[in-house]
A protein has these predicted regions:
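Acidic, mature catalytic/reactive cores of soluble proteins
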Residues: 1-336
């Protein structure tokens, strides 16, 4: 009898799951957790904790789709506790004594706020008032000479280089460093960088922040020119995954998709079409985008074996569904 009553109470309190959309919303809500007095997004069950990159990428979908902005605000306020002098730590945890920082994480914060503005009634002026100091601190941190492994170069692009560990979402590593090294100018980092500066300028313009506009106003043009010069592979008609002063990595990977999907783009329409064409041809599957083209000699078609072998496959062929949203956005921009 007690079990029957308990089951009845559970069924009454359980969220509706009468449609695919309701099932998605219900499942997404399970990643919102309360821990250490904070509202966080769990990166994955069962062994992942909370990270800033995963939080910023997932938060709009989890907290703004069929939900209220209250959860969004709570998660952002919790994440802001882990922003140190303009850099978000990789991990959201009160137990981390020496936080580590990645090249792209802080830039995803700008993208998250862009989705926030689109889905709520918050104005640009309000967002700048509440988050402007953090946004300025992030941009200035990349300009600072203190951070040699992640810095703005003279050409306006972000140079990230650390032989001891990975600095992007390609985060598999061994005792010898990143399993898939990507040192130098990284394509999605710089696509996010351009988007971040353009969005900050738009907010600052609405808020009449003349000092910020004066300091950063000419940067988009410089970055766009450098981006096309550094990343565009003229012989192949797509973007390098990363590049340095003497070499372009020509492997076909999904990271270049962000250069076609964000709100502010450095590529003209013709180049966007070329990038989408190669992604569609070599990376698109019914489940998401491959992390590497099957045409590459490094392609791994299966994720089996020991930890090192599986980690290598994760970023050399395994499919990642999270790119699907950006693939759709890029196509909508071009084809409506």
């Amino acid at each position: 009898m007690q079990r029957t009553l308990a089951n009845a109470k559970y069924l009454k309190e359980r969220a509706d799951r009468n449609s695919f959309e309701e099932c998605l919303q219900y499942t997404a809500s399970q990643f919102i957790i309360q821990k250490a007095g904070e509202t966080r997004i769990k990166a994955g069950y069962h062994w992942y904790d909370s990270t800033t990159r995963d939080t910023f990428i997932a938060l709009p979908g989890i907290a703004l789709s069929g939900s209220t902005a209250k959860i969004f605000d709570e998660v952002l306020q919790s994440a802001l506790k882990y922003c140190y002098n303009g850099r978000f730590a990789r991990d959201i945890s009160t137990h981390i004594v020496n936080p580590v920082f990645d090249a792209d994480t802080s830039l995803w914060f700008f993208w998250t706020l862009q989705q926030y503005e689109k889905e709520t009634t918050r104005t640009k002026k309000q967002i700048w008032k509440e988050y402007g100091e953090t946004l300025k601190a992030i941009l200035n941190a990349f300009k600072s000479p203190e951070h040699k492994t992640m810095r703005m170069d003279d050409n306006g692009l972000i140079w990230s280089d650390d032989l001891s560990r990975p600095l992007t979402w390609f985060n598999a590593e061994s005792n010898y460093g990143a399993i898939v090294p990507r040192n130098g100018y990284v394509v999605e980092v710089n696509a996010l960088w351009y988007n971040a500066i353009c969005y900050a300028l738009e907010l600052a313009k609405d808020a009449k922040d003349k000092t910020f506009l004066s300091e950063w106003g000419t940067m988009p043009e410089t970055i766009a020119e450098s981006f096309n010069q550094i990343f565009w592979i003229e012989s192949e008609k797509y973007l390098a995954d990363y590049a340095n002063h003497t070499h372009q990595n020509t492997e076909v990977r999904p990271n270049q998709l962000l250069a076609c999907a964000l709100d502010y783009l450095t590529l003209n329409e013709k180049r966007q079409r070329k990038v989408l064409a190669i992604i569609t041809q070599e990376l698109l599957t019914p489940k998401g985008l491959r992390s590497l083209s099957p045409e590459s000699p490094r392609y791994e078609g299966e994720s089996v074996g020991n930890v090192f072998v599986r980690d290598k496959a994760t970023f050399n062929g395994s499919i990642h569904p999270w790119f699907v949203g950006f693939y759709v956005e890029a196509n909508l921009k071009l084809f409506g």
